[in-house]
Amino acid sequence: MKKVFVQLSLALALIACSGESIEDRLIEKPQIPQETPKTPETPKKPETPETPKQPETPETPKQPETPETPKQPDNPSKETGEIKVPLKLKAYYLGVDFTKTGNAFRNELAAHTIKKHHTFLGYGQRNQYLSKADADPAHRGNAILLYTGESRNYYASTVNTEHVFPQSKLSNAGQQKGDLHHLRACDKNVNSTRGNLPFTQGSGRARKVGGGWYPSDEFKGDVARMVMYMNLHYNLPWDRISTDGVKLMLRWNAEDPVSALEQQRNNVIEEAQGNRNPFIDNPYLATKIWGGNPAENTWK
């Protein structure tokens, strides 16, 4: 017992030296596990909001295709010459729309020319008018002969009447045969040599060229304007009269200007049968219809 007491006393002394109370020593404190403090998570950076997509640029609407320029009628005039009808001809051409071109203008001018042709002469009536139409102003009683340009008595036995558009190639021998606009005083032998040959290109004097007839440098424009009148009035085909169709007539119309004799004929024939050859009044009217070599616009 004494031994136990001594051991207990020693134990208490040790406790006293450690500074702990007897209750603390006797009551075992539960060990509170110490948590290792967690390293605080680095806060996430707020997500950068996505850059909003730019709205797609709408496609530039396609420009409507420029419509193709409608094709003009065959060989329309590319010229834009202004037409000013002379005062002395305004009454005659009243109602004609000179702003038109191509076939539209051809149809209008043809209708006007036909309407004005109110007196139809028989072929047997020609001399009383042609003797005035083809008269040589410098020599009373004489006529200027087609193709040669000679001045000769109109009623001479060596003179007869040339159909510039041959009778054998007319479609209506009656009315067309007596139309003064394509009848000319001519040397009988020259007329016979020409026969019904189509007109063709050449140079110099009137003569045969290959299978055609060249009317001379001096008269090729006269011939072209008479032939174009016959096409306009009667719609006679070009291949009956020219080896190069309307192109040759347009070339001659441009190269050989209207003569004083042609103007004289136009005035006399208007008095006789009512209508005029519009291509003598202004060669440029042919250019407005068929194009080709541009002729002089005498109505500016």
Summary of predicted features, one role per range:
Residues 12, 102-113, 224-231:
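Short, Φ-rich (hydrophobic/aromatic) sequence segments
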